[in-house]
């Protein structure tokens, strides 16, 4: 499996590998999961001089149905290789069990937490998104979040949020809000909008049209001739906003599209990165704009947030992460854990209802620019304390900045409750920069509360 971020030039690499294989007399079976992707890779093959008479370029369904008549390939290449765990792909792989195979993907990740070791022997990691931005292979971006969704209403069905619960969580006002924020931050620029349902996508397009902005809805049921014309009009700038559900998630390339509008909450990291990075194709002096109306960054971070792809590839990451998950909430002041129904911390008197009020206000707040450092801080604050004192101090400081409170108290509280980690006053003083007296005073306060 070969991992490389969206927009990093996978089609060029695929074309070169295919060309090298055919030059040696080989035959390549190239699998895609959607017919819309065939034209794009065919064009790439032609540009790079790949002899098409030595390549079978098929959707996975068609390939499975033709196994008895296809000439045996010497190499199988799967586009969007994270789909390769599906039964249809597995039948093809089993039929050609002795044929080497490559799977290309931006995201070797499955919501189930399963890995890919049963399908691929190894994974090769490409450059990171951060590297690609710094080296002018992807456009830099500005990320905005409009908290116009009540996430408490989201419900999971078949692995992701159900359309009905998304309808309930979004409400009716989001349609006007999305147009308003597009005008405010990206007026006149080409934008791709991702909705959760055909009805929602059509409503967004109508709202843009009523505001005098040329927008259209397109989906998989749109006739091909009409869809091709709409895509051409979008590329030529006659259409400014292209509203869709899942059609423009993989293999769609419009380098001068500068704006992505996210209106579909998702638990899928794959979907989030494919959609959020759609406007990050590199052009000179281009800065992409990502408008997240559904707070997807809370679950997935930002496009250049670091991910441990090897851990995802090997599998089991979800089970590892769930071992110590407790249906509870943590006091931001003293780190004590309480039932979700708890209104006040019995140890330090922290009022949990303050966060609930702040959350409600935040959902009504203006669109705000999310700084990358803020996201990194949030991710760090959610890490668990461990055996490294310096790392624990970083986590304690991050928790204090994100959730308020005293970082020294958070650190000392952890060591007081831990039955396996320890640190002396002198060691804590050296790492934190606090005096022995300050640390002793803090310990005495905790002792007065029956903690030490």
Swiss-Prot record:
Listed Gene3D superfamilies: P-loop containing nucleotide triphosphate hydrolases
UniProt-reported outcome of changing residue 394 to K: In strain: Isolate 3-1 and Isolate 3-5
UniProt KW keywords: Metal-binding, Zinc, Zinc-finger
PROSITE patterns linked: HELICASE_ATP_BIND_1, HELICASE_CTER
Domain of life: Viruses
Domain Helicase C-terminal: 177-333
Protein name: 51.5 kDa protein
Organism lineage: Viruses
């Amino acid at each position: 499996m070969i991992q490389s971020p969206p927009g990093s030039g996978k089609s060029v690499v695929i074309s070169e590998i295919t060309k090298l294989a055919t030059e040696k007399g080989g035959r390549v079976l190239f699998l895609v999961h959607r017919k819309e992707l065939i034209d794009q890779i065919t064009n790439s093959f032609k540009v790079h001089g790949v002899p098409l008479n030595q390549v079978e370029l098929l959707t996975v369904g068609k390939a499975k149905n033709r196994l008895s008549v296809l000439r045996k390939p010497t190499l199988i290449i799967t586009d969007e290789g994270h789909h390769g765990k599906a039964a249809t792909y597995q039948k093809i792989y089993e039929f050609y069990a002795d044929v080497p195979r490559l799977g290309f993907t931006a995201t070797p990740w499955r919501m189930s937490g399963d890995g890919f070791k049963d399908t691929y022997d190894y994974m090769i990691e490409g450059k990171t998104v951060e590297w690609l931005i710094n080296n002018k292979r992807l456009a830099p971006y500005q990320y905005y979040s409009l908290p116009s969704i009540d996430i408490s209403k989201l419900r999971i069905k078949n692995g992701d949020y159900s359309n009905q619960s998304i309808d309930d969580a979004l409400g009716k006002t989001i349609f006007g809000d999305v147009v308003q924020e597009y005008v405010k931050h990206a007026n006149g620029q080409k934008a791709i909008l991702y909705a959760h349902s055909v009805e929602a996508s059509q409503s967004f397009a109508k709202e843009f049209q009523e505001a005098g902005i040329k927008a259209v809805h397109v989906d998989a049921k749109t006739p091909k001739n009409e869809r091709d014309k709409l895509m051409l009009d979008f590329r030529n700038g006659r259409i400014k906003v292209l509203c869709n559900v899942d059609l423009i998630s993989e293999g769609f390339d419009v380098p001068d599209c500068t704006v992505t509008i996210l209106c579909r909450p998702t638990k899928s990291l794959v979907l989030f990165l494919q959609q959020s990075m759609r406007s990050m194709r590199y052009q000179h002096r281009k800065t992409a704009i990502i408008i997240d109306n559904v707070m997807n960054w809370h679950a997935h971070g930002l496009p250049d947030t670091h991910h441990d792809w090897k851990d995802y590839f090997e599998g089991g990451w979800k089970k590892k992460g769930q071992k110590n998950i407790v249906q509870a909430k943590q006091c931001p002041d003293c780190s004590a854990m309480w039932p979700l129904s708890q209104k006040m911390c019995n140890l330090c008197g922290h009022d949990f209802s303050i966060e609930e009020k702040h959350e409600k206000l935040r959902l009504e707040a203006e669109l705000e620019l999310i700084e990358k450092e803020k996201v990194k801080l949030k991710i760090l604050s959610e890490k668990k304390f461990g055996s490294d004192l310096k790392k624990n101090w970083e986590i304690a400081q991050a928790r204090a900045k994100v959730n308020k409170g005293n970082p020294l108290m958070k650190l000392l509280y952890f060591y007081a409750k831990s039955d396996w980690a320890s640190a002396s006053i002198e060691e804590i003083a050296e790492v934190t920069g606090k005096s022995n007296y300050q640390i002793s005073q803090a310990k005495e306060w905790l002792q007065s509360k029956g903690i030490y």
